[in-house]
């Protein structure tokens, strides 16, 4: 099995600890005036999504996690599980709602998502960085009503709510940045 030394640690690296896959969120190299150097690392458990902090002595090695990031197409959900399909082999995978998390606000049927698999089980689903979604409900923008900064809430077809400019109307398709949950522009046809 592949291993990583502490000097190879960087954000996004996937490692195994205590039998669970973790991803490195933050890595800080510390060299005290006296004693051995060490790495203070923040890790996110990919199964539970909890963040833990751990220290590793400089030069220590850890096992690489056997996780795979793959592009899968979202099909449907039945309330408990979200079903994805591999577009090349047409093989389907069921991800629990806990693995989908906040991505549920942004994905609709037929969207392609990045899914992290461990032992062929989906652990985490990431929505595309930008999605085009239709506005299903928003207040009419009244001309001259800019005291609130010129934005209003709009409910999208997936159920998510974002702040949009006053000129946006119901039925329009918007481009949304899923990382910040922000309106970017009107979608181009």
From Swiss-Prot:
Annotated SMART domains: EFP (SM01185), Elong-fact-P_C (SM00841)
**Purpose of the protein:** Involved in peptide bond synthesis. Alleviates ribosome stalling that occurs when 3 or more consecutive Pro residues or the sequence PPG is present in a protein, possibly by augmenting the peptidyl transferase activity of the ribosome. Modification of Lys-34 is required for alleviation.
Which organism was this protein described from?
Answer: Halorhodospira halophila (strain DSM 244 / SL1) (Ectothiorhodospira halophila (strain DSM 244 / SL1))
Please give the residue positions where the record annotates the modification N6-(3,6-diaminohexanoyl)-5-hydroxylysine.
34
Descriptive protein name: Elongation factor P
Q: Which GO terms describe its cellular component?
A: cytoplasm
PROSITE patterns registered for this protein in UniProt = EFP
Q: Give its localization.
A: Cytoplasm
Q: Does the keyword Protein biosynthesis belong to this entry?
A: yes
Which keywords belong to this entry?
A: Cytoplasm, Elongation factor, Hydroxylation, Protein biosynthesis
User: According to its UniProt record, which protein family does this protein belong to?
Assistant: Belongs to the elongation factor P family.
Query: Biological process (GO) annotations?
Result: peptide biosynthetic process
Superkingdom is: Bacteria
Q: Which Pfam families match?
A: EFP, EFP_N, Elong-fact-P_C
Annotated InterPro entries: Elong-fact-P_C, NA-bd_OB-fold, Rib_uL2_dom2, Transl_elong_fac_P/YeiP, Transl_elong_KOW-like, Transl_elong_P/YeiP_cen, Transl_elong_P/YeiP_CS, Transl_elongation_fac_P
Q: How is it modified after translation?
A: May be beta-lysylated on the epsilon-amino group of Lys-34 by the combined action of EpmA and EpmB, and then hydroxylated on the C5 position of the same residue by EpmC (if this protein is present). Lysylation is critical for the stimulatory effect of EF-P on peptide-bond formation. The lysylation moiety may extend toward the peptidyltransferase center and stabilize the terminal 3-CCA end of the tRNA. Hydroxylation of the C5 position on Lys-34 may allow additional potential stabilizing hydrogen-bond interactions with the P-tRNA.
Q: In which pathway does it act?
A: Protein biosynthesis; polypeptide chain elongation
User: Does the keyword section mention Protein biosynthesis?
Assistant: yes
């Amino acid at each position: 099995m592949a291993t990583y030394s502490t000097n190879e640690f960087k954000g996004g690296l996937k490692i195994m600890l205590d039998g669970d896959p973790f991803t490195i969120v933050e890595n800080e190299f510390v060299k005290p005036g006296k004693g051995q150097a060490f790495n203070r690392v923040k890790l996110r458990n990919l199964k539970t999504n909890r963040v833990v902090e751990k220290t590793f002595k400089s030069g220590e090695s850890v096992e690489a996690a056997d996780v795979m990031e793959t592009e899968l197409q979202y099909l449907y959900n039945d309330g408990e599980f979200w079903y994805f399909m591999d577009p090349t082999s047409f093989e389907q995978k069921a991800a629990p709602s806990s693995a989908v998390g906040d991505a549920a606000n942004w994905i609709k049927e037929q969207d392609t998502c990045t899914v992290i698999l461990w032992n062929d089980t989906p652990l985490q689903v990431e929505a595309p960085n930008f999605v085009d979604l239709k506005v299903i409900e928003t207040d009419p923008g009244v001309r001259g009503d800019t005291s609130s900064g010129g934005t209003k809430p709009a409910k999208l077809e997936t159920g998510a709510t974002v702040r949009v400019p006053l000129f946006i109307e119901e039925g329009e398709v918007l481009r949304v940045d899923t990382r910040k949950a922000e309106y970017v522009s009107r979608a181009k046809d």
